[in-house]
Swiss-Prot record:
Residues passing through the membrane, by range: none
Deleted gene: phenotype: Leads to an alteration in the product spectrum, with an accumulation of 6-O-demethyl-10-deoxyfusarubin and 6-O-demethylfusarubinaldehyde.
Gene: FSR2
GO BP of this protein: methylation; secondary metabolite biosynthetic process
InterPro entries: COMT-like (IPR016461), O_MeTrfase_dom (IPR001077), SAM-dependent_MTases_sf (IPR029063), WH-like_DNA-bd_sf (IPR036388), WH_DNA-bd_sf (IPR036390)
Keywords, in A-Z order: Methyltransferase, S-adenosyl-L-methionine, Transferase
Source organism phylogeny: Eukaryota, Fungi, Dikarya, Ascomycota, Pezizomycotina
Species of the source: Gibberella fujikuroi (strain CBS 195.34 / IMI 58289 / NRRL A-6831)
Protein name: O-methyltransferase fsr2
Record-linked Gene3D superfamilies: Vaccinia Virus protein VP39, Winged helix-like DNA-binding domain superfamily/Winged helix DNA-binding domain
Functional description taken from the UniProt entry: O-methyltransferase; part of the gene cluster that mediates the biosynthesis of fusarubins, highly pigmented naphthoquinones responsible for the coloration of the fruiting bodies. The non-reducing polyketide synthase FSR1 is responsible for the condensation of seven acetyl-CoA units to yield a haptaketide. After rings A and B are formed by aldol-type cyclization, the PKS-derived product is released as 6-O-demethylfusarubinaldehyde.
Catalytic residue list: H280 (proton acceptor)
Induction cue: Expression is repressed under acidic conditions, while the expression is induced under alkaline conditions. Expression is induced in presence of sodium nitrate, and repressed by glutamine.
Protein family according to the UniProt entry: Belongs to the class I-like SAM-binding methyltransferase superfamily. Cation-independent O-methyltransferase family. COMT subfamily.
Length: 387
């Protein structure tokens, strides 16, 4: 079954379930979902999945309990609850085994990385949002978040990661994994969201470009593009290492520059300034500063491309797709006091940064969770915006 068919089946099932729920069945499912999550987290914490042989082999519960050093009775209860999600299975003779789904979280390193990050880092933040709201109320401070509550720190998310190499390693692995494996956020969607060929020979500035995945992809696909990767010193060193392994015809068109996007943009009059999954990490006040730094460097024909989520209006489309986007919106709140934005919020953000900045187009490629917002400077403020 391909992704489109799978998504359609899941959506229809979700809609049917919503229609037939009553308060009792709703609460029963709600509690079960919480238990299911915590059981999967327990399995990950004690490395249970790695102690189960690959299909079609199976193993006695007692043997897994001994290997993982966990109580047998707890292992049985936890594993059997996890099975109600479709993860793992039990043979007719009462042994524990992987099924097709659970085996992929062992054999596929990207799926394993994402599972571990979600259960260890993402979901625990949900419990901190109540405490953060009670403590700080209406705040946009990046160090007054659910993340601060859960980790007991006064540092912002990225500053705290600098002090915790273990968390930083997991976060970086998760981001790289999503970029290459998660169909909704795969960097390749950028290729189809904008007419790069129409630029001809052009300069593209990849702001916050990290280790260079986006720039390398663009340089490989479009031989007339020259790229500049901008980021802080540490990720820039990673980009240098990656570029050293590339063919000369690609790396010769990629420049690397240490840069803090809260400072003036050093590259003037570039054809494209690209912000890919950057602005959703920042509250409006900080996002405006980032955009203003770019606007000051833009020429009359420069384009600002923002690749980020554009939230749908509530109930305007697929429930499951909307839920997937809104859980990421909440993660932005919990980590940064930032947000994913709707079209009108993007329009307002750009206008606050500079009234001349007008949206020309918004494109979400098929299968992508992210949209590409194209904006240019318009010296005629009275002219209507794209939408």
């Amino acid at each position: 079954m391909d992704k489109a068919d799978r998504d359609a089946v899941i959506e229809h099932a979700t809609q049917v379930k919503r229609l037939v729920h009553d308060p009792h069945s709703f609460l029963t499912e709600l509690v079960a979902q919480q238990q299911q999550y915590h059981c999967i987290a327990w399995l990950c914490h004690f490395n249970i999945l790695s102690n189960i042989p690959q299909p079609p082999e199976s193993i006695a519960y007692s043997d897994v309990a001994t290997k993982a050093q966990v109580p047998l009775s707890k292992l049985q209860s936890v594993a059997r609850m996890a099975m109600t999600t479709g993860l793992l299975s039990e043979t007719k003779d009462g042994k524990l085994s992987h099924n097709t789904l659970s085996a992929q979280f062992i054999t596929n390193v990207h799926m394993k990385t994402q599972l571990l990050h979600i259960v260890n880092q993402t979901v625990p933040l949900m419990t901190g949002l109540i405490q953060a709201t009670w403590k700080w109320g209406e705040t946009s401070a990046t160090n007054e978040t659910a993340y601060n509550i859960i980790h007991g720190t006064e540092l912002s998310f990225f500053e705290h990661l600098k002090t915790r190499p273990d968390l930083n390693e997991g976060f970086q692995a998760y981001m790289k994994s999503r970029a290459v494996s998660h169909t909704g956020s795969n960097v390749e969607h950028l290729l189809n969201a904008f007419d790069w060929k129409a630029l001809g020979q052009a300069q593209v500035v990849d702001i916050g470009g990290s280790s260079g995945s986006t720039s390398i992809m663009l340089a490989t696909a479009f031989p007339l593009l020259n790229l500049v990767i901008e980021d802080l010193p540490e990720p820039i060193e990673n980009a240098k290492a990656r570029l050293s392994e590339l063919p000369s015809d690609i790396k010769s068109r990629i420049e690397i520059m240490a840069y803090d996007f809260f400072t003036p943009q050093p590259v003037k009059n570039a054809d494209v300034y690209l912000l890919r999954t950057i602005l959703h990490d920042w509250p409006d006040a900080d996002a405006i500063k980032i955009i203003q730094g770019i606007v000051a460097a833009m020429g009359p024909s420069s384009r600002l491309l923002i690749m980020d989520m554009v939230l749908p209006k509530p109930g305007s489309g697929s429930v499951t797709f909307e839920a997937a986007l809104r859980q990421k919106d909440l993660t932005m709140i919990q980590c940064f006091n930032a947000q994913e934005r709707e079209v009108e919020e993007w329009k307002a953000l750009l206008t606050k940064a500079d009234p001349r900045l007008k949206i020309q187009a918004i494109e979400r490629p098929a299968g992508s969770e992210l949209s590409v917002i194209e904006a240019m400077l318009d010296e005629s403020p009275e002219q209507a915006a794209w939408f």
